[in-house]
Amino acid sequence: MNQTILKTMIAEWLEEFALPALIPRDAAPVPADLRNLSEILAIVGPRRAGKTFVMYQMIAGLIEQGFAGRDDILFLDFEDYRLRDFAPEDMETLFSAFRQLTGKDPAWLFFDEIHQIPAWSRVIRSLHNRGRYRIVISGSNARLLLPDIATELRGRYRDHLILPFSFKETLRWHDISWTERTFYTAAKGDLLRIFDTFLKTGGFPEVLKKDSPGERRQLLQNYYQTIFYRDIVERYNIRAKSLMEGMMTCCLHQFSSLFSLSAFEKGLKSQRQPGSKRTLANYLAYLQEAFFILCADKFSYSPRQRVMNPKKIFLIDPGFIALTEDFSENKGRILENVVAIELYRRRQTFNYYKNRRECDFIVRDAESVNLQAIQVCWTLTTGNRERELRGLLAAMEELSLPQGLILTYDEEESLPAAPSRQIAVMPVWKWLLG
């Protein structure tokens, strides 16, 4: 690759680039943890969720606390069009260009969207093996969260998940502070106002900057199209674009609902359209890997049962729901989707429960030892109270859980469910701030 291009980009970073004003992210690693970084640190999450700004936050912290100077750091965005032809063998040319401009090797490597490089894991492993660099990478592919990536990097790897703003971070964006006392004062109205907007707009940082619903919707539509074309069609060389688009559209409209590959395949056959179940399973995996959807399996101790049953689909950000039907028709499902995202953010494993009754979430901790049953609805009414309670109780009884949780828009109470069983009702917004 042309070294002049690399020198230009390095010089832009060293001399011209000003770190932007930042909204601190809760999930960002702190400088003290980075100072003696010995592993490869991967910042992973959806496109446009703020991964680059998290890297900026890390760099700013290192510089402000005196752990590094600007010329100790090499930052490069591999989605820059000037790097479209960058190959693994160009890495030495890159370091040579840096040395010519600074007189030394970089101590820190910040490589944004690293998965754009062919055989990137081999390249990063080779750099790490030299023992000269502290390495931070980012990527918009959920495969970077999978164990096989850690295996490829010989276990010298840990990931850090960055999603669009949480509700807590959205309050920070709007410069609204809160304490537990706020929940019981008139200032609670400000929290609910922002929460209402959060349910309709989501947490993509650039979307929050837009003033009108039309501008926000257009930007979300652009994100949707970019995920489809760049993160799925181009990355996986999809030939049956209409089939892939049909599945993505189906998932968009079926958020917080069950999705059956068998039923989808039958629908294709009835319309005389091609699409094997294996192909559909691959396409569903691509949507997950592109951070467009989350999938929850049916709760079962049998791996076969988990695989054979339909999956429950959730969108990675509630803002995408604005591309579908009217908000008022989907309020309960939107709350459920928001809960799923937060569980994923907290790196908790969750399934749905479905027997004769239904419960929205069975949540497991990291060791899969402690279980929690959670039901989600917009409000408890005379029409749905019995159904929601019976579904939650069925899960609690089968799994021997003494406590259950119902999350609603803004209700709070404690329900004596049965002997030795207790059910708490709590507002979703308060749970999100916990």
Regions found by a protein language model. Give the residues of each.
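N-terminal pre-Walker A segment at the start of P-loop NTPase domains
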Residues: M1-V30
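Accessory nucleic acid-recognition modules appended to NTPase machines
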Residues: Q3, D72, S212-N370
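Hydrophobic positions on the alpha1 helix immediately C-terminal to the Walker A/P-loop
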Residues: V54
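Hydrophobic anchor at the beta1->P-loop junction of P-loop NTPases
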Residues: I43
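Conserved lysine of the Walker
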Residues: K51
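Short glycine-rich substrate-engagement loop in P-loop NTPases that contacts/grips substrate
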Residues: F75-K104
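Structural recognition of the conserved hydrophobic beta-strand(s) that form the central parallel beta-sheet
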Residues: R134-S140, L161
